[in-house]
Structure formats: C-alpha cells, structure tokens
Regions:
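Asp-based, Mg2+/Mn2+-dependent phosphohydrolase catalytic module
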Residues: 1-9, 101, 105, 121, ...
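N-terminal helical cap/lid subdomain that shapes the substrate entry/recognition surface
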Residues: 5-101, 105, 109
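Conserved G/P- and acidic residue-centered "switch" motifs that form tight phosphate/ATP-binding loops
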Residues: 14, 18, 117, 179
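Short, flexible loop segments at the rims of nucleotide/cofactor-binding pockets, characterized by
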Residues: 90-94, 118, 191-194
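Glycine-centered short loops/turns at secondary-structure junctions
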Residues: 110-111, 191
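Thiol/selenol-based redox catalytic cores and closely related redox-interacting motifs
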Residues: 114
C-alpha cells in the first residue's frame, strides 16, 4: 500500500452469479414469461443483453426489441409472474456459487458486508433463508429499493449511504464482487474497485474492462486478498 491509499473496510456482493448460481433459473423464468407474451428470448440473448439487469428493465428491453407496447400494469404483472416462477425453480435447484459460503464467512470476520442486487428482496430473502448466510450482511439493496438498474451506480451508492448511516466509510473502501458487465460499470461509476467472477462471462471477455481482479470463482481465494485493492 502507498501512504494515503484507502484500506478496504467493506465488501459488497452482487447476488445472482456471485453468491447463488441461479442465472440459468432467471433465464428460464424470463424465457417462459416472455413466451406467454409471444416474445422469443434465446439463452445467448439473455447472457449478452439481459444479464445484470433487474426484471423491470429486462421486460422493458424485451418489449422494446419486439416493438411491442408495455403498459405499467402489464409490467407489474410480468415482474410478479416471473418472480413466482423463479422461486418455484430455485426451490428445487438451489446451488450456491463454488466457495461462496466459506468466503462470506471469512470476509465477515474482516470486513463489513452487503448485498447489492437487481433481484427482488423476496427472492434474496428466500435464498438466504435456505442457507446460513443471512445474518452475515449489514446492508441489502434490492431491486425494490431502486428506480434505476445497473449499470447506473445508484444501487452501490445507496449501499454506501446505508453503511455511512451506521459508521462512516469511504466509497473507495468498499470492494465490489460482480459477475456482469453492467455491475462492473456500476461499481466503477460509484468509485469502488471491483472483482469480477467468470460465472457468466469468460475471462477473456472481462480483460481491459477495468476490473481490479478477475477470479474463476470464490473457491481457493481468501478475503484477505481484497485488503489492498
């Protein structure tokens, strides 16, 4: 560390693809709901265009791409329908990202922890209830809390504000762990260093994007590696 550098004090985790390996379930649920509206979404399109977006933004994008009108009432219905389907899927196929439980427990002994996600709060709570990680997080920012989706930095800035209300912390002292390009853009715009996981994109697709580190997974890594970012 160079004198004057900020030491890491907190770690902010994205949720889907970082803590829980559920992007396939989100993709499946979105595909099914859109199919009922006669809109086709391929898996390739999901990972290229929709990964990292909250459900509201995703449906707006899908209807815009299909040149279809989406009313506020229909949008609300589709978000609820997709969330219900996701919860049904994840109940029978929940899988945490490799190394996530151990990493979170270790990180919690060294840093303040938070979740910043485009998922709905009830989805986050449901998954945390199925694990023993729920008490690890001081701050949780979900899609319900925000009007702007990543890559807008608002959700990461909201997490920083929430930390500050409890005990002051510099934004630069918050390290983000993400798996999506919009998430990386949001973290950088918030002034936070970002570690990228290759859960959803190959390492070569993340090169030159401004990530502080690129890891294949959380397994085999120590939270202490974040101390000097």
């Amino acid at each position: 560390m160079v004198e004057g550098d900020t030491l890491t004090e907190a770690v902010l985790f994205d949720f889907n693809g970082v803590l829980v390996d559920d992007e396939p379930q989100h993709c499946d649920a979105l595909q099914r709901v859109l199919a009922d509206e006669r809109i086709t979404l391929t898996r390739e399109q999901y990972y290229a265009q929709y990964l990292g977006l909250d459900d509201r933004t995703g449906f707006v994008l899908a209807f815009r791409n299909a040149q279809r009108t989406l009313t506020t009432e229909l949008l609300k219905h589709l978000v609820t329908k997709k969330s219900q389907l996701y919860l049904e899927l994840v109940r029978t196929s929940l899988r945490l990202v490799r190394g996530a439980p151990e990493f979170v427990r270790e990180a919690g002994r060294q840093f303040r922890l938070g979740i910043v996600s485009g998922a709905l709060r009830r989805e986050i709570d449901h998954v945390l209830d199925l694990t023993d990680l729920g008490d690890s997080f001081e701050v949780i920012i979900a899609a319900d809390d925000m009007s702007h989706s990543k890559p807008d930095p608002a959700s990461y800035l909201a997490a920083h504000d929430a930390f500050n209300r409890r005990r002051p912390i510099a934004a630069r002292a918050c390290v983000v762990i993400e798996d999506s390009l919009p998430g990386l853009q949001a973290a950088r715009a918030a002034g936070m260093p970002c570690v990228m996981l290759t859960t959803s994109h190959p390492a070569r697709a993340l090169e030159g994007r401004g990530a502080a580190l690129v890891w294949d997974s959380l397994a085999g890594h120590s939270a202490a590696e974040l101390a000097g970012l």
